[in-house]
Amino acid sequence: MKENGDSVSGQDELCDLTIIGGGPTGIFAAFQCGMNNISCRIIESMPELGGQLTALYPEKHIYDVAAFPEVQASELVESLWGQAKRYDPEVVLDEQVRQYKKLDDGSFEVETLSGRTFASRALLVAAGLGAFSPRKLPQLGDISELEGHTVLYSVQNMKELEGKKVLIVGGGDSALDWAMMLLPHAEHITVAHRSPDFRAHGKTKDDLFAAAEKGLVDVHLNTEVIAIDHDGPALRHAYLRSKSGKETSLEAEYMLVLIGFKSDLGPLAEWGLELCENAMVVDSQMKTEVDGLYAAGDIAYYPGKLKIIQTGLSDATMAVRHCLNYIHPGEKIKQQFSSIKMAKEKNK
């Protein structure tokens, strides 16, 4: 398999586990398959592995993954793939799974929107939030001319914001994280949020307000963007209005609209599985109500679930570990310790 996998072609042979989704959870599940000596296949709807980390914020810095005090999203994907690729998992890109079928012998067959079929002994859904699209600002009307140019819903290249006047719209972790990351690079940062308080982590809020006190960033709470001026795809000004009626005009060369995404499970929602909070309900073994069909990461629901990368990695480990009992019924499953397994592999 080639790095960031080239799509395979033709009808594929039966493998032990098909993993639907090639984000962090899916990639780590592939590593866990290798650790447990079972074959796997990742089917990813995007042209690259990495899920949201690759598609939405490859340059964002992440701080809450164990052993990484700070890591860029794209680098985390590379590290995860570096772990998994030693076991040569099959990777199928640009294919969205449409439906599954459980066969009489207990194995599974999935079919993609293009009509390709893949067979495996068990199935793991690690498709994140499903298909996602950014939430926009409907009050601005049709701004498609600016989208992807000076109105952005994710940051693909931080260098284009170097020395620019940037307006960030939003109040969650993503909005405030980008505000803090861009402070050393942008000419000026303005953050506008329609609510009276931010929804981000406490420390991030404290850091932003501290920067505001130093005059490094302007913060507007209870405020919405009501209009913009532009020259073709070039943004010139933005106009803000607070809930008290105060209006503010500011120069802005870029506007980052970071107010979240609308998720859609797409065909997965039609599988007839129990759903809660737009996710598949699983038990303590990450199994759905269908024996042999597991879910992990953001698409898996259980009481107390946290939708963060770290939890997804744990989910993947649990799902693969317990699917062994389905793939190899009646066999005693031994606990694999990575240090021992890697030492044996190096001595081969």
Swiss-Prot record:
Signal peptide from the UniProt entry: none
Swiss-Prot/TrEMBL keywords: FAD, Flavoprotein, NADP, Oxidoreductase
One example GO MF annotation: ferredoxin-NADP+ reductase activity
Cofactor(s) recorded in Swiss-Prot or TrEMBL: FAD
The organism's place on the tree of life at top rank: Bacteria
Sites where the protein binds FAD: T25, E44, Q52, Y57, V97, F132, D298, S339
Protein name: Ferredoxin--NADP reductase
Protein's organism: Chlorobium phaeobacteroides (strain BS1)
